[in-house]
Amino acid sequence: AFYACRNLTRVALDGCTVLETIESYAFNGCYQLSGFDFSQLTALKDIGESAFSNSALAGDIAFASGITQLGRNAFSGCRNITSVDFSKSTQLTVISEGTFRYCQNLKKVDFSNCASLNTLNIGAFDNCPALEEVVIDNGFYTSIDGVLFVVDKASLLLYPAGKKAEAYTIPSTVKTLGERSFPYNESLMELTIPESVLTIKGEAFYNGSFSGRGAKVIMKAEKPIGLSQSIGLENALVYVPKGFAKAYRE
């Protein structure tokens, strides 16, 4: 509808109580669009693919209760968004791949009270270097100090790229580290992986998370974890239990 309207700066939404869908690419390429109050759109359910990609939306964004899903790359490249609040969005069910990709100043995403959110694609937060915390606790996902897990804490899904901690010990409940669960984080210099971890999925440590910068990974398990693909630790400092270095190399 407004695709590539490069001089559009604001959309007045006063009294807009029946709008249910914002279609794919609706405001894509509106590079100066900064005024758009989603909290007024009480009937809004769906935001389509790349609907607001590369717009100038900025600051804190809050959604009303009716939103159910955000499409692929819906807000990708919105570099000035600093936080997203879904705490009133009790019907939210789907966050798609790339939804907030390249939102370089995004620090916090709040999913508290999103009891129906059952599809949270971790690729939604690709290349969000400032992200410090994801807040959620429902029947599908939970977070501890901003770190995202499945609800039983058996799988660690995302350690945010902007989290400010020099060291982190993975909880002993964790059995699996998910794909791209540890993006590059310049603050994190020491990661301890407990014996409970049995599976590390492909590219768990990506974008050079621990490579060539002095950061170290401490493996507590004596028996090496079997790997079928690259996890991204090829050039990292990895410490293993004394006497088991050969087993890890093999």
Question: Where do the PLM segments sit?
Answer:
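Consensus positions within tandem repeat domains that build extended binding/scaffold surfaces
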Residues: 1-3, 23-28, 48-51, 71-76, ...
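Predominantly extracellular/luminal carbohydrate-interaction, adhesion, and secreted-enzyme modules
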Residues: 3, 205-206, 230-233
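Structural signature of tandem-repeat unit edges
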Residues: 6-21, 31-46, 56-69, 79-94, ...
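Short, aromatic/basic amphipathic alpha-helical patches
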Residues: 229-232, 246-250
